[in-house]
Amino acid sequence: HPDYPAYGDRQHPMRNNIAYKDKPYNFDNYLDYMHGQVRELCTNYGKLDMMWFDFSYDDLTGEAWRASELVRMVRSLQPDIIIDNRLETSGEGFGSLVTDQPSDFCGDFVSPEQIIPQTGFKDSRGRNICWEACITMNDNWGYCAKDKNFKPAEMIIKKLVECVSKNGNMLLNVGPDARGNIPAESVEILEKIGAWMQKNSDSIYGCGGCDLPKPENGRITRNGKTLYYHIMENSIGGIPLQGISLDEVESIRLISDGTEIKPLKNWIVENYPDVVFVQVSNTVKLPDDIDT
């Protein structure tokens, strides 16, 4: 847009072009245009689930975008929409959503980029704050023919589980080429993730974390009264299901095929009465070596 600041801006293609240094512009003209484009999106395309503003930086943050006005307009047209936190921050920031005084445009979730936080996010009263880790498949958001540093499907699956176990979500980027084709490497990775999800999606969709300690060999996700122990490494002498007692267990099953697993009751574990142990395989190999 001709009224978007160019010279010296962090993002503009002409940011280093001296010819643009003294070019006059009226930023309000750009904001009128931008607000109009957002109004069009919220009006002409049915019910929208999410509005993802990306992103704020330097002096262009918060009310520099007329953010309160913008959010009021979006929510008036799409009352059920979810909005990210980047009208006041970027991928490295959390914004006022995590403070005692969230702004009118703080959004509905935190969006850490290219990192999974060590813990989830809570407000000052200890309530969970929604968040979403924004992750690329390789090292670029857009298509990059030379970038072959793709994360393996096994890693992405485990990181997805990690996000959910911390009450978060994962946004996974796919960068199509100029013709709209998804790279073969991405397709292979997505197919492997899809195959795992076909068997294990109940442990992801609708789930979050719990207050139990993280197992040494995996993660825990939860949906209501159901705990999903994600076993990523086998144990010797039985797999301990930390945090629960035997009298709390109604049943234990492999989510992939429904096989019932009986708690171990033998001499090996008899001196650990406060721990539930299970054996999910008759060999040292787990049924799913990525995440059982």
Summary of predicted features, one role per range:
Residues H1-T292:
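Mature catalytic domains of secreted/periplasmic carbohydrate-active enzymes
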